[in-house]
Amino acid sequence: MMYGLLKGKKGIIFGALNEQSIAWKVAERCHEEGAEFILSNAPIAMRMGEINALAEKTGSEVIAADATSMEDLGKLFDAAIAKFGKIDFILHSIGMSVNVRKGKHYTDINYDWLEKGWDVSAVSFHKVMKTAWEKDCMNEWGSILALTYIAAQRTFPDYNDMADNKSYLESIARSFGYYWGEKKVRVNTISQSPTVTTAGSGVKGFGGFMRFAEDMSPLGNATALDCANYCVAMFSDLTRKVTMQNLFNDGGFSNTGVSQKVVDKYNGE
């Protein structure tokens, strides 16, 4: 169902790789709700993915940018300003861990890889906002979002150093969000259920954990489409006074100590 919630709004969406990507679903829903946007991802990710198909579907321009590069980000935002003038929303859906990819245990992580993942997954969010801030390119009541996961606050062993990255990401949203208030721009993170994406599927034991989260969540896991709908709401004018928050979109998992389904399994029922 479409409501025209984003009619006339312009933005930048980072991180769409393929149809499994949450950012891909967000782009589709933003388009359906009337928004125009630029799609961006790192050059290597664009070669691996299918972003051009999404661009064609949504009538969007694709601009390659390494979100860890201030030079690339500067060029991207200059292009957005030339195309749209000031913009209304930004989605940061970027994350990676070389330690996870290489199967390094948390007690034996490679610190060079740690730094790389930290830069890509968290510091890039600060760099994106710093670039937008310096170019003064956000309209009043604009909205900036990043996607995160509850492992930022609770221990999930196989999530490895991505948990640390997400924790820092959430802190950046609060810290920079305070200053963005001066410009009447809101900054939030959405803590999503475990979701089948290219990045998420690389975590050891991911399938089992998804089933566990489903059993633990009163409403079940939130899908990528559910997350996209939440992003649309957060980009819309209906949420103007929501800022500096970590918003759980997880079917109630974050506030459930134990569910009856899980208890029954341990009781053999």
Language model: regions and residue ranges:
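Conserved glycine-rich Rossmann-like NAD(P)H-binding loop of the short-chain dehydrogenase/reductase
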Residues: 33-51
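Aromatic pocket-lining residues of Rossmann-like dinucleotide-binding sites
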Residues: 30, 180, 234
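Catalytic loop of short-chain dehydrogenase/reductase
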Residues: 15-25, 95-182, 191-196, 220, ...
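Short C-terminal tail/terminal secondary-structure segment
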Residues: 243-269
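C-terminal helical subdomain
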Residues: 123, 189, 207-242, 247-251
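Conserved mid-core segment of classical short-chain dehydrogenase/reductases
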Residues: 57, 63-74, 78-83, 89-117, ...
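Hydrophobic structural elements of the Rossmann-like NAD(P)H-binding subdomain
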Residues: 13, 91, 145, 187-190, ...
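Canonical Rossmann dinucleotide-binding motif of NAD(H)/NADP(H)-dependent dehydrogenases/reductases
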Residues: 3-39
